Amino acid sequence: AKPSDKKIGGAFYSRFNEFRKPRVFTSYMGTITTVLQQGHELGHAFHYWLMRDLPVVQTEFPMTLTETASTFNEAVIRRYLLDRADEKEAFGMLWQELRSAANFLMNTMVRMDFELAFIEERKKGVVSAKRSVDLMRKAWHEWYGDSTVGADDYLWAYKLHYYKTDQLIYNYPYTVGYLLSQGLLTELDRRDRDFMPFYRAMLRDTGRMTVDEIVERHFGSNASEPAFWEGCMKGALGSIRRFASINPNN
């Protein structure tokens, strides 16, 4: 869609099962953020396109696997740009990497903890705005500690995911997808030219396997063991160390 100062950036992916075709709408605003946003949605489209010949029932994958190809696409784009960046550009790209890590590993979990607490409160009756703020502050402090001044008190009021009545707890799947995408980067480095057959096979299984089964069959690991997820986090931790070593004034 044509950019305009009267618009905000945005993108979404959809699919047409009858025609077996994915579609992406996006507004390119001339920023790296919108490039990554486009990459995210194209990851969704590629995921479905790989499954287009399967029975429709096998193309319906759980939310925990929905965000894997999309976040992996983002990660690949960031890596590509980072490999070709000078130190000043690398600082900006690593900042984007750290923003993603903080969003998927911390902010997303704040949203989930708040939503779970809100559901428990709602069982007792109507939850007031004041009580919602209290619940958000508690969840925020659990994850951010004293690293921020205050909390995003009204995140519950403006975050669209809370109002998708057909999908409860639509938060943590992003964390699972992010961690799996980091694991996929490790597989990309390890497999090199053999990566794409592995990746295609994994994505095609997402509509007929659980996360645990995907991890066991394709990664050869146990999803119930913290070691697998800690291994997936190594890439993000490496980006933090590299970011800390760069002087932005150079």
Where does each model-flagged region fall?
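C-terminal, non-catalytic "cap/extension" segments appended to globular domains
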Residues: K2-S4, Q38, F46, D83, ...
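Post-HEXXH active-site segment of zinc metalloproteases
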Residues: L36-Q37, Y48-A75
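Short, solvent-exposed segments of well-ordered alpha helices
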Residues: M29, T33, E60-T64, A101, ...
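Post-HExxH zinc-binding segment in Zn-dependent metallohydrolases
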Residues: P62-A90, E97-R99, N103, G177
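Short, glycine-/Ser/Thr-/acidic-enriched flexible segments
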Residues: M29-T33, G43-H44, I77-R78, L179, ...
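Short beta-alpha connecting loops at secondary-structure transitions
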Residues: R23-S27, L54-F61, M93-S100, I119
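Active-site-adjacent "gating/activation" loops or surface patches in catalytic cores
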Residues: A1-G39, G43-H47
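Conserved helix-loop functional segments at active or binding sites
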Residues: S14, H44, Y48-P55, R79-D83
